[in-house]
Amino acid sequence: MNTSISSQPPRIRIFDTTLRDGEQSPGCSMPAQQKLVMARALDALGVDIIETGFPASSQSDYEAMTLIARELRRPTLAVLSRCLQADIETSARALESATKPRLHVFLSTSPLHREHKLRMSKEQVLESVHKHVSLSRTLIDDVEFSAEDATRTEEDFLIEVTRVAIAAGATTINLPDTVGFSTPEEIRNMFTRIIANVEGANKVIFSAHCHDDLGLAVANSLAAIEGGARQIECTINGIGERAGNCALEELTMVLKVRNAFYNIDTSIHTSRIVSTSQLLQRLVGMPVQRNKAVVGANAFAHESGIHQHGMLRHRGTYEIMRPQEVGWVCSHMVLGRHSGRAAVEQRLRALGYLLEEEDLKLVFEEFKQLCEKQRLVTDVDLQVLMQDTTVQHGYRLASMTISDIGNRANALVELSDPQGQRVAETAQGNGPVDALFGALAAATGVKLELDSYQVHSVGIGADARGEANLSVRHNDTQYEGTGTSKDIIEASALAWLDVANRLLRNPENMQNKQNTALA
């Protein structure tokens, strides 16, 4: 591992881009209020830098940055900008309220991008880097420059680009594996050689941003650390463009479990990993696969008799980390019908929610109603309540009636619209779910094409609930929806409304969002 850079911090800086690159994952768009909720959780998780969006390309991202900056003081808050003067100036304005602002500018450097995307020569790229990094530094002290598609850029030219960016005032240099093309050995060697051959390399932090197109994002990020990188850009659950990004939960647990090998730490409070992962799944309606490392439902499950026997003798036989280390443990505080508002507020804070008085009052009323239906209230239940009461403003399900008539089913749904007015519609379909979705489409005016639909149980025993997950298309864009209820048909309706409300709340979702992928 490269340890010759004396200015590098003794730990890895975690740069979370869930709210920017992660949001570019199909169906994962978040409006400003949802981004604030997620940013609170990332702050509680201990993330060093939170990239909130691309304000020059989206008014919603501009508003999200403003909301987040007003509240969060500890982490550095970053926004992404192209190497364009207007973009940079807009981004700087969005950062005005931030206590620790960072302006993140990028420009493609590979021959493929120079020829077909930018139509710029090497000299023009170098000139643009110098001009726009210099401009950024006059507006914001903390400037990160990313050489997009760095891993497919000629090494001698990448050295020159990096030198120019540092000379112009960049404080962090990011060398992304934009299309997930590289191998760990290539990434390690690239960072080692760039750091060794660039004048001023000891004055900046080097960063890696690896995509998962070949399933190597985490491995490549670890290799970058071995090569001298001291910032890793990642997302919760690995969401992001195409196959996604380096998964924060996997990277941080590798560094923790294999600390004797890497000998470097992060600031992440790992016991909050699972709750943060589950919050994101709820907000964007995209569940992780059950066998997902660290945060999947089966991550600590043992079914084989041989494995179970070993676990009974000693957990270390088949577990390299304890479930409690990442948050797979129930709260010691049991919430139920006798719990007070202070207890509910404390648990919500632990899950990353900081509520105003009016919102807390509304959530607590919903909590008491839920306690009349079930004995105990879990973290999953609280996250569902937060969706229903403070995030998912829009159409609310008031009632529904499903009936089967021969080979056809009838559905009657009654909704409360965003203005509080009641809307009722009926529809027929090939089965109860088909009829239900038809009635919901008629009531909301939103047309969704169903790709996949799954229902499974969450929770334990009598308090278990059904969770519906569906994948749909709208205007050729894919979206994921999640709903939870004691009744699986109601859960299905809530999952459908989850998508519809996101589309209706954010008009940008009704169109194809501008592709601003930096990877």
Swiss-Prot record:
This is 2-isopropylmalate synthase. Pathway: Amino-acid biosynthesis; L-leucine biosynthesis; L-leucine from 3-methyl-2-oxobutanoate: step 1/4. It is an enzyme of class 2 (transferase). It comes from Xylella fastidiosa (strain 9a5c). Keywords: Amino-acid biosynthesis, Branched-chain amino acid biosynthesis, Cytoplasm, Leucine biosynthesis, Manganese, Metal-binding, Transferase. NCBIfam families: leuA_bact, PRK00915.1-3. HAMAP family: LeuA_type1 (MF_01025). SMART domains: LeuA_dimer (SM00917). Residues 12-274 form the Pyruvate carboxyltransferase domain.
